[in-house]
Amino acid sequence: MRVSVYYWVMTRPVRPFTALPWTSDLVAVLGDTMAAIGALDARISASSVASAWRIRASWAGYATALRLQRFEIDEIDVFSALVGLPIPHRPPVATMGEPFATYSGWLRSLGDRSEHHWRETLPFSFEEPEGWSSAPTLLRALGVLDLWSRRDATINVWLAFPALCARMGLTSSPLPSLALGDPALRTLHGPRVAQLRRLLKTIRENCEDGLARLDRLEKWRRDFAAVIAGELRPGQLEDLGKLALTTPAVSARGVSNRLGMTVSGAGKLLARAAERGLFVEVSGRTSWRVYITSEAGIALGILAAPRGRPPSPPPPSPGLDAVLCAFDREMEAIDRLLEKG
């Protein structure tokens, strides 16, 4: 039965997205979606915490791709598995196979700056469908995703969309927020216009979520810098802040190894940062304490997002500027390492 269904799907005539009839409503949805992509891409391109953001956004993107493969796995489960951190009151993921096996390679690929033409990366022979020459670039990208999804039953097709968008010129670099799709593309269930509309809506919502994550991360960076600038004896708080940008989940033992201090001293340092609202303890009733940054805690649903009007950013000062510059130099060094692979 499975073979016959597959044969029916592969041989059924399908109208490509690039040839669907346009309505004013669909044009408006496409315009809003392209604007959302452009806004996120512009912010990420100019942000000094782009690499740190990619790590955080990759949890959500990978979780989306897993759910499209019918895994009942949420972002917090991806985070827990990748950092080796059991989340209190949350059962471990029970699933067959190795759902996280492709994550590391995918994350590395998000930093790929090779200039391959997008057609060279497709695992199938591509022929331009009807309406291709006059279609907007985003519609072309979704058309490729549509074709790809029926030729590749693995998670790779959903994870490949960020790089495809970058190679087609939609974004300056692969954005993990664009790891998405729709199972209906494989089964051809439902009207094609409805499938396209769902994809456009998902892209817009993911980009808006990506901007919110970036806002929280940049605010966390400013708040941490303000705390350090206001301390008479900051000690290794600054080093902890730099570490947390790329490793948002930390323990006293891990900090001890990375910063060259005693476990006891690292525990006190983390407790000090937690008292100032920069970290939250998530270890529960265990013999070792684990902390994550407050902005990551909000993204994972461990912490509630603050309500009301956000507080004003700390006023400029020489001390604050010096700390922010040090953070930025650290991120630039990390970016160079990632580019080298």
Question: Where is each model-derived feature located?
Answer:
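FIC/Doc superfamily catalytic core
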Residues: 1-341
